[in-house]
Amino acid sequence: MGYYTQYVFTIEEGPEEQYRSMTREIDGILSCDDLSLYESVYAKWYDYEEDMERLSRAYPEITVRVNGDGEDSDDLWQDFWHNGKRFSERVRFADYKDIKDKLN
């Protein structure tokens, strides 16, 4: 089955040609040409974390930001990858019960 996510890639620092090589490798993993052309791909990427850890080690001079927007409305996140390491942030939306007193 699977779950679709919109992945948007941005190079934060490092050689542009290495970044282009990385996006071409990701196109190969996902069997598409979207990422190297548009820096964005809507896909089911089952091994995202393992693949990105491996790729960021293969291209240790670059830092990449990946923004994700999943099928569920509350699935928004961003990851920064550099030399096999990841810094991850997730958006957390408040529940109504947690904020209803702020509306009065």
Please state what every model-predicted region is.
Residues 1-27:
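Short, extreme N-terminal segment that most often corresponds to the first beta-strand
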Residues 23-104:
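Charged interaction segments
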